[in-house]
């Protein structure tokens, strides 16, 4: 007669109590509020057995549960023999380590290690279990923005790029930012799509978020980034990509023309460059340039060059886009300065002649005119009604435009004043009463050559000492000690004429009238002018009083004046008579 199943089971348990305890442990339902161990992908998972080691412990075991609830034993340790055995489970081969206190370690944590592990401590009478749940985390790679657009265009929705985040567990979330602010989806302006792909061999996720964006002009320097938000052992974290900046294309809204010149003002002879630019991006590369008086534009790049400009280049210049939709204009003034000097170059005139000189200018602004003679600035413009030797020299008429840098003109006049030699002789007895000094005052240009001749006897102490030739004048002198009356002749000769003048000189023993060696020509001219004025007044009064008396008086006056001049030129009448008598005696 067979035993009932229940009775048979009880009998079996009495014979094999340990087996019954293990079977009972396997049939226990999962407990709530399980202990969790957080592990990092690739690191070692450490799971302590959270049971108190009982008396009479025979061994300890670790197992994990399959998704369907069935157990898989992986490690065994005997409390008596102190030996450890690892079950033949391929996923955990060479990865397990069970310590004396029944702490289980798993090397090189994987995503597949996310399971419910159970620590079992077995005695003869009981089996104790404590489950541990393992959670594995993998930090993702830094986000990268790939497949970036070459440029963005306003008013156009365009793929900006893809933010790729690799090897994350659990899967993370990707967010786009512009200048540090979250980009929220806006229809036809901001379009974001996220895809997640799991690697079946590793269990890791790769997230790809694409961004389509319609920019504005203000986005020209905007920084775009993407951030992945993921979970780690210590909580939620984020990683940001490197920022990227995109070139934003937008149409030209304004055209500007500028004048490129080395100075603020333009003068004749300068090179001028006109530059046209548009505020679009990219800027226009070609424009139409309009010069004054022309209706058709000249097609060119963004610059138009004019070389060696003239005054007729003054006017309004324009530039426009090729389609002529936008235009700008600017005015150019080419400054000029003309100078006309009459006469100019080398001019030769005779002394006493008149020479009209004019320096006229024509300019775009008021100009300053000044004269320079022989490197010295003149106070007034030269005027020659009666040329004198001192008027000769190098004249420069110079004019400048103060407001225009580098604009000045100058012309030169080299004035040569020629004259035939003019001679005036003077004599003076020296203080030692032993000699006389005879001076020949000479005027003329070119400079006359002077020669002396002596008629009579007498010793020539010092001959031909010449003063400096200044303003067409110089003097030559000799010192003589005549033993008798002599005649000295001064000969002055230049390219125009030869002039000869003689002077009678008494013997040193005969006193005579001495003339001053030199007189100031200006003073003599003033004296002559005053004399003429006085004579004129006197003559007028006498004419009113008595015409006949005045005529007689004038006749007498002129006779006396003539005799005085004769005396002055020849020495005096007495001296001449004495000289004639002495000469006559000598001849006898």
From Swiss-Prot:
It is found in: Cell membrane; Cell projection, Axon; Cell projection, Dendrite. Residues 34-532 are extracellular. It is a single-pass type I membrane protein. The chain crosses the membrane at residues 533-553. InterPro entries: CD80_C2-set, Ig-like_dom, Ig-like_dom_sf, Ig-like_fold, Ig_sub, Ig_V-set, Surface_Rcpt/Adhesion_Mol. Residues 554-588 are cytoplasmic. Residues 1-33 form the signal peptide. PROSITE patterns: IG_LIKE. Disulfide bonds join 49-119, 163-226, 276-319, 359-397, 440-490. The keyword Glycoprotein applies. It comes from the Eukaryota. Cell adhesion molecule that mediates both heterotypic cell-cell contacts via its interaction with CD6, as well as homotypic cell-cell contacts. Promotes T-cell activation and proliferation via its interactions with CD6. Contributes to the formation and maturation of the immunological synapse via its interactions with CD6. Mediates homotypic interactions with cells that express ALCAM. Mediates attachment of dendritic cells onto endothelial cells via homotypic interaction. Inhibits endothelial cell migration and promotes endothelial tube formation via homotypic interactions. Homodimer. Interacts (via extracellular domain) with CD6 (via extracellular domain). Homodimerization and interaction with CD6 involve the same region and cannot occur simultaneously. The affinity for CD6 is much higher than the affinity for self-association. This is CD166 antigen. It comes from Gallus gallus (Chicken).
């Amino acid at each position: 007669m067979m035993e009932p199943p229940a009775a048979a089971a009880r009998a079996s348990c009495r014979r094999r109590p340990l087996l019954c305890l293990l079977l009972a442990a396997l049939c226990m339902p999962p407990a709530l509020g399980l202990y969790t161990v957080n592990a990092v992908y690739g690191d070692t998972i450490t799971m302590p057995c959270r049971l108190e080691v009982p008396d009479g412990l025979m061994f300890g075991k670790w197992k994990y549960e399959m998704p369907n609830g069935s157990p898989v034993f992986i490690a065994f340790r005997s409390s008596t023999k102190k030996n450890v055995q690892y079950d033949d489970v391929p996923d955990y081969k060479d990865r397990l380590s069970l310590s004396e206190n029944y702490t289980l370690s798993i090397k090189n944590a994987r995503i597949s290690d996310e399971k419910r592990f159970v620590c079992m401590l077995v005695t003869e009478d009981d089996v104790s279990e404590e489950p541990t749940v393992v959670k594995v985390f993998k930090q993702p790679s830094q986000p990268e923005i790939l497949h970036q657009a070459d440029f963005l265009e306003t008013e156009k929705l365009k793929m900006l790029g893809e933010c790729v985040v690799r090897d994350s567990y659990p899967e993370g979330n990707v967010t786009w930012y512009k200048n540090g602010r979250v980009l929220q989806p806006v229809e036809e302006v901001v379009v974001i799509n996220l895809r997640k792909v799991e690697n079946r061999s590793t269990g890791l996720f790769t997230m790809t978020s694409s961004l389509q964006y319609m920019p504005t002009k203000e986005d020209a320097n905007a920084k775009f980034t993407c951030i992945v938000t993921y979970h780690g052992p210590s909580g939620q974290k984020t990683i940001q990509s490197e920022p990227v900046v995109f070139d934003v294309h937008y149409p030209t809204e304004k055209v500007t023309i500028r004048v490129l010149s080395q100075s603020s003002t333009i003068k004749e002879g300068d090179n001028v460059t006109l530059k046209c630019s548009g505020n679009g991006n990219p800027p226009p590369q070609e424009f139409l340039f309009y010069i004054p008086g022309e209706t058709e534009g000249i097609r060119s790049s963004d610059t138009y060059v004019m070389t060696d400009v003239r005054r007729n280049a003054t006017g309004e210049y324009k530039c426009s886009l090729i389609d002529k939709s936008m235009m700008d204009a600017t005015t150019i003034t080419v400054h000029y300065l003309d100078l006309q000097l009459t006469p100019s170059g080398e001019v030769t005139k005779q002394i006493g002649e008149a020479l009209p000189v004019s320096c006229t200018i024509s300019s775009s602004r008021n100009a300053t005119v000044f004269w320079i003679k022989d490197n010295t600035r003149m106070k007034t413009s030269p005027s020659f009604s009666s040329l004198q030797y001192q008027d000769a020299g190098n004249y420069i008429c110079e004019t400048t435009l103060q407001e225009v840098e580098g604009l000045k003109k100058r012309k030169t006049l080299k004035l040569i004043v020629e004259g035939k030699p003019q001679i005036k002789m003077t004599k003076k007895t020296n203080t030692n009463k032993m000699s006389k000094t005879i001076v020949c005052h000479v005027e003329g240009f070119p400079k006359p050559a002077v020669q002396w001749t002596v008629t009579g006897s007498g010793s020539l102490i010092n001959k031909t000492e010449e003063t400096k030739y200044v303003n067409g004048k110089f003097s030559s002198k000799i010192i003589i000690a005549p033993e008798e009356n002599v005649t000295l002749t001064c000969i002055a000769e230049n390219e125009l004429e030869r002039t000869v003048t003689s002077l009678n000189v008494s013997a040193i023993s005969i006193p005579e009238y001495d003339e001053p060696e030199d007189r100031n020509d200006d003073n003599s001219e003033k004296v002559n002018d005053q004399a003429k004025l006085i004579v004129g007044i006197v003559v007028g009064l006498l004419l009113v009083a008595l015409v006949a008396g005045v005529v007689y008086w004038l006749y007498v006056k002129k006779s006396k004046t003539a005799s005085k001049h004769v005396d002055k030129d020849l020495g005096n009448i007495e001296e001449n008579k004495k000289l004639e008598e002495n000469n006559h005696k000598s001849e006898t």
